[in-house]
A protein has these predicted regions:
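Membrane-interface motif at the C-terminal end of an N-terminal transmembrane signal
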Residues: 1-9
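Electrostatic cytochrome c docking/interface patches
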Residues: 9-31
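Extracytoplasmic/secreted proteins, especially bacterial periplasmic and envelope-associated proteins
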Residues: 22, 26, 30, 53, ...
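The canonical Cys-X-X-Cys-His
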Residues: 31-43, 98, 120
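Juxtamembrane/interfacial segments around transmembrane helices
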Residues: 35-47, 79, 142
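Acidic helix-start/capping segments at beta-turn-to-alpha-helix junctions
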Residues: 45-60, 140
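Extracytoplasmic electron-transfer domains, predominantly the class I c-type cytochrome c fold
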Residues: 56-106
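Flexible coil segments in periplasmic/lumen-exposed cytochrome c-class electron-transfer proteins
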Residues: 69-73, 99-147
C-alpha cells in the first residue's frame, strides 16, 4: 500500500492567524485543538493515517480544509477575504458544522462545549469586525455575489 505524504509545509509565524491577531492563550489552545489539524500547516497526523484507505480520505480532507481556510497563511489573505473567512468560520462553529463530527470521533479534545463555542464565535466575529473597520469594508461587501 502507498502511504500518504505527511509532510507539512513550512510555517512562518509572521503569517499565522494566532500571533498576528495576538490571540489570547486560552483561545489559542482551543483553536489549535479544534481547528489546526485540518486548517493549518501544523497537522499532527494520527496513527490511522498509515492505514489505507483512511489515510487517503484523511489527506484529501486536510488538503480541502487548508484550501478553504489555512490559519498558517492567514496574513497572505486580502482583508476582505480574511473578514469573509472569519465570518464563515464563526457561522460554522455556531451552527455545529465545525469541528466536523467525523473528526470529533477520534479527537475528543477538539470537542467544544457550548461556552467554548460562544467564546470562539465571539472572538472570530470580533476579529472580523476589527478587520472590516481597519480596512473600510462594509457589511454589504461580505455578502456572496449574486450570479
Amino acid at each position: 500500500f502507498f502511504r500518504i505524504d505527511k509532510t507539512n509545509p513550512p510555517v512562518d509565524k509572521k503569517m499565522d492567524f494566532l500571533p498576528i491577531k495576538k490571540t489570547p492563550e486560552n483561545l489559542s489552545k482551543m483553536i489549535k485543538s479544534a481547528c489546526y489539524d485540518c486548517h493549518s500547516n501544523e497537522t499532527v497526523y494520527p496513527w490511522y493515517a498509515n492505514v489505507q484507505p483512511f489515510g487517503w480520505f484523511l489527506k484529501d480532507h486536510i488538503d480541502e480544509g487548508r484550501r478553504e481556510l489555512n490559519f498558517s497563511t492567514f496574513a497572505t489573505y486580502e482583508p476582505l477575504r480574511q473578514a469573509k473567512k472569519l465570518n464563515k468560520a464563526a457561522k460554522e462553529v455556531k451552527e455545529g458544522e465545525m469541528p466536523l463530527e467525523s473528526y470529533l470521533l477520534m479527537h475528543k479534545e477538539a470537542k467544544l462545549n457550548q461556552e467554548q463555542k460562544e467564546l470562539l464565535v465571539t472572538y472570530l466575529l470580533t476579529m472580523k469586525d476589527i478587520t472590516m473597520m481597519q480596512n473600510g469594508i462594509s457589511e454589504e461587501e461580505l455578502k456572496p455575489k449574486q450570479k
